Amino acid sequence: YIGAVLDRNGLRPSRYYLTHDDRVIMASEVGVVDVATDNVKEKGRLRPGKMFLVDFDKGELIDDEAIKTSFAGKNPYQDWLNEQQIHLSDLGCDTEAHGFDPDSLVHRLKAFGYSAETLQFMLLPLVNELRDPVGSMGNDSALACLSDQSRIIYDYFKQLFAQVTNPAIDSIREEVVMSLSCSIGPEGDLLQNKAENAHRLVIEHPILTNEEAAALKHCNHRGWTTKTIDITYDIDSNHNLSDMLDDICQQGSQAIKDGHSLIVLSDRNISENRGIISALLASSALHRHLIAKFERTQVGIILETGEAREVHHFCLLAGYGVDAVNPYLAFEALWQARRDNLIDFEDNGTVVVAYRKGVAKGMLKVMAKMGISTLASYKGAQIFEAVGLA
């Protein structure tokens, strides 16, 4: 056999000729090989997501529908999905989700590096305009590594963009091929077709509400259980950052050995006596550790953090291996803004809905800059450059 398949967006040209003397010619453009017009039996182009196969033994050309039909009928794949797939709505939770604690809000906002500008220029536009805030062309602020101000680790990373061989996508006009839906959790063996391979959790949006996060933290559904790892530390501890990251990684490996399907990294225990390890550092360290141990496909990584609040932050977390994020402190900051009449929403629930919509549009825009249309392809891709970090 020899064949070809075109990407689902149709961004790569592919044209073919079938001649009367039984030759098949395929190339990115017409005219690569000279063919007499009267010798052309059939010609066409490979369309988005379509396949093309030549069977040398039978001496025939197999079209896309025949290829897919032959494989689709081998197993009851739809039945497998209906029986095995898990959705967030399937997870019942008897534990009440964390609510709003206005008394400690200011202290926690300061601990996580929030500023008045963060709320005014980043969070409020996300919910009011339902999109990532847009500024004038150019960014003349100092690089994080050269700034006189204390900057969070996310500011040291710059997003890459598609160049030459990988064209960017218009995330608005090509919305039909863009998706933030993703399956997470233990993966089956790709070499074995069996129903258990479909036993995964489908998350439609990478930003989790507090209720969804609570359901995942206390998950006990059809064999799925969760291990929560605290990423805060005692400020009087003698352990250095490297030791604490190693401990998180070892706890992650042990969770897999104990049979857990999900790992939740949480910094909710922050207090005047407990500091925080950056959520980006902790999650990326665990992700890379599990890859090195060949264990990453056996578990999903969920992040419950007050650190992430901007679109860039969520893109970084996804790019370095996080499956979903619950930005609980961003929600609380916006709820307080609603109480202060800075935004006009009916209730806290509608604020969260608007925030998730704004973040979704922003993440799709960032993915589209790299020519990537699905979150599954963007996750763990590490398409960033670190400036000033060793």
Protein language model annotation of sequence segments:
Residues 3-4, 23-69, 73, 78, ...:
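Phosphate/diphosphate-binding loops
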Residues 5-7, 60-234, 239-247, 253, ...:
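Extended, highly charged accessory segments
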Residues 33-36, 135-143, 226-243, 262-274, ...:
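Glycine- and acidic
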Residues 236-247, 255-313, 319-320:
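Conserved structured catalytic cores and adjacent interaction surfaces
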